Structures are given as C-alpha cells and as structure tokens.
C-alpha cells in the first residue's frame, strides 16, 4: 500500500509533487473545538518557506495555505481537515536535461525502477517540497498540544558540517536564518554557506528537536513504542540518514551506572533515555537528534547513467539548498508533534481512567 499517511488516531495524508499544480493534505482525528486559522498554520510555513534568505533555495513560493474543510466559524468540527497550497514558482525547464538521466544521490533511479515512470521535474513526489504539508498539519498538532496539555515542541540546528554549537539559548533561535541557538556560531554558519556556494557544493547538518511537558504514559508497546514511531516519523523526512533518541549512539561507550536515569521523590536524576523508557514517555523532555545528508543537487559534475544504462555525467541545474538542514528545523518539529498528538489521543482512548497511587515525578 502506498505510504502517504502517518498516524492512527491523528492521521495525516499528503499528496502532490514539486512541480505539480498544488500540494495538499487531509488531517483526520483532530478533536472538535480547537480554534484554528490559516494564519496559525502560516507562521510555521513561513519558517520553512523557500526563498526567504540567501542561505536557502531561491525558489520563491508564498506557500499560502488554504483550509478547505473541517473548520467552521474558526473552530475544528471533528471532521476531516483539508489543506491546500498552490505551487506558483515552478521552473520545469531547469530539469529538461535530466529527463533521461538519473541524478546521483537522489531518488530518480529508485522511483524509475519501482514505478516504471517518474516525474523528473524537481524530483516530483520525492522532493522536499512535499514537506510543506507536513508542516501545515504539524502546526495543528502543535497548537492543540500547547493549548490542551501545555506541550511545547521546538527544534534547532545544532551542527552544520564541522561547525557545532557550544550552547543553547532558545530565545536566539528565531533571531537568525539558521535556527541556531548559539549566537557565537552564526557567523561561522554564514561563512560556511558562502564558501559552499562558491564551490557549488553542499553540506550535511544535525538538528535537535525537543518536546517539553509531555505527559507520562504515551506509547503503545511493543511495536508502536513511542520512540519507534518518533524514529519512523523523523526518518521519513527527506535527506535524514540517522535518528537518535536521548543519548543515541553515545550509549555505546557509557556504563550502566552512568546511563541509567535514577529516580527520587524529586524527579529523575538525568535524562539519558531522552524521555522514553520501555517505549513509554516518562514525563521528562523528549529529546531526539536527526542527521541530514548533504543534498546531491550541486553544480560539481557527477558520474551517472541514463535510462538506457549508458555512462554519462550530470551537473544539476535549478535552485537548491546548500544545506537542507536549515529548512528542516520546522519539519522536524511538525513530525514530532504529529506523533505526540497521535499517541496522546490513543492513550486517552484506552487509558483515560487509569490511575496509580505512585506520584508522578
């Protein structure tokens, strides 16, 4: 079955291609009565939107979202919410040279072999353009989580290439085009992007995404563990090649006495587990990191083949991000929000009346 949907109780289904007429999604399962407007969704969409700075692709899409259904007099009705964003700045001629060639490092070859046909314009369905609808749907989840439960989901760029942050100031993130929480690293990020543009190359990145005030108890062992679904959602983002929950791969060198998060009446002594134990939220911050590969859409020539299997070379034309990690920050927030929202509704449906004598720490 086609993999265009995510979630069970809060379910998001997206459609559309990079150079198609429009992008869209259907959001099922949102509780009724949530005050929501196009302006609420637009805030996050503008953070992801292309062409907003010299550090990202210069494709200029307004990404103005339209709410087609599921909202009446400013409130959700409990029915399917239909969202639509029109594509307005396609330059399909930029891709005429790759009609019969496969861009190395992209999904061209695999889509062609799987479906026997591919939309070569900007990558079609495999383009990160599709994530605009995830961000729109995620904005609904973020607002509900914040209003109903005080859950807040935020992310930041923690590393680009060899440049890594040394500190986190949440108030600094929206003050620069890199979503960087360390003001002392902004200039280094700026210089790195400038150098990459001169070279016609790209670079990878790392993003940390955090959910605070998540209730204890979310997650459905054993196959729908909360961390498993988070990893699934984050890995579904274009260019993501690695996901860590909590300390992630650092646990390899840790001892049990160091890694375990001790408990006391005052709370947990640490959060190496990233807010999840046994696939269930602990009530601590949920912390995840994602690693994004450098985009293969670069002007450095690369070896490839054409549809006939013949050797050739390719220089990618078009408008592309030197570092896709920059605009992936709001996408990571959206995907974590969608998963937490889904699990919160699932937990409420099955375990609403559950209580224990043990105090929540």
UniProtKB/Swiss-Prot annotation:
- What Pfam families does the entry give? Chorismate_synt
Family classification: Belongs to the chorismate synthase family.
Please give the catalytic activity noted in the UniProt record. 5-O-(1-carboxyvinyl)-3-phosphoshikimate = chorismate + phosphate
The superkingdom listed in its UniProt entry is Bacteria
Q: Where does NADP(+) bind?
A: 48, 54
Name-wise, this protein is Chorismate synthase
Molecular function, one GO term: FMN binding
Cofactor(s) essential for the protein = FMNH2
Read off the InterPro entries from this record: Chorismate_synth (IPR000453), Chorismate_synth_AroC_sf (IPR035904), Chorismate_synthase_CS (IPR020541)
According to its UniProt entry, this protein's organism is Vibrio vulnificus (strain CMCP6)
Source gene? aroC
């Amino acid at each position: 079955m086609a993999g265009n949907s995510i979630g069970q109780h809060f379910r998001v289904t997206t459609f559309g291609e990079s150079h198609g007429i429009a992008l869209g999604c259907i959001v099922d399962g949102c509780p009724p009565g949530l005050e929501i407007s196009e302006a609420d969704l637009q805030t996050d969409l503008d953070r992801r939107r292309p062409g907003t700075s010299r550090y990202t692709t210069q494709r200029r899409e307004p990404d103005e979202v339209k709410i087609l259904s599921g909202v009446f007099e400013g409130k959700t009705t409990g029915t399917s919410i239909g969202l639509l964003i029109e594509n307005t700045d396609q330059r399909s001629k930029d891709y005429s040279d790759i009609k019969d060639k496969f861009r190395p490092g992209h999904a061209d070859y695999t889509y062609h072999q799987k479906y026997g046909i591919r939309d070569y314009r900007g990558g079609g369905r495999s383009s990160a353009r599709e994530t605009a609808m995830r961000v729109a749907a995620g904005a609904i989840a973020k607002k509900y989580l914040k209003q109903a439960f005080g859950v807040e989901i935020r992310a930041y760029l923690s590393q680009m290439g060899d440049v890594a942050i040394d500190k986190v100031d949440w108030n600094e993130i929206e003050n620069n085009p890199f979503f960087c929480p360390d003001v002392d690293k902004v200039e280094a990020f700026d210089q790195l992007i400038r150098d990459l543009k001169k070279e016609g190359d790209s670079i990878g990145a790392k993003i940390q995404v955090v959910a605070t005030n998540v209730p204890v108890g979310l997650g459905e062992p054993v196959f729908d563990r909360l961390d498993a679904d988070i990893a699934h959602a984050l890995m579904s983002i274009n260019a993501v090649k690695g996901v860590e929950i909590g300390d992630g791969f650092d646990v390899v060198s840790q001892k049990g006495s160091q890694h375990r998060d001790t408990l006391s009446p005052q709370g947990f002594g640490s959060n190496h587990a990233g807010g999840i134990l046994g696939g269930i939220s602990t009530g601590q911050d949920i912390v995840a990191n994602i690693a994004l590969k450098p985009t293969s859409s670069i002007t450095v020539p690369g070896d490839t083949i054409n549809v006939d299997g013949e050797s050739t070379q390719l220089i990618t034309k078009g408008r592309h991000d030197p570092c896709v990690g920059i605009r992936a920050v709001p996408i990571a927030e959206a995907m974590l929000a969608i998963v937490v929202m889904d699990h919160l509704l699932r937990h409420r449906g099955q375990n609403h009346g559950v209580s224990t004598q043990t105090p929540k720490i």
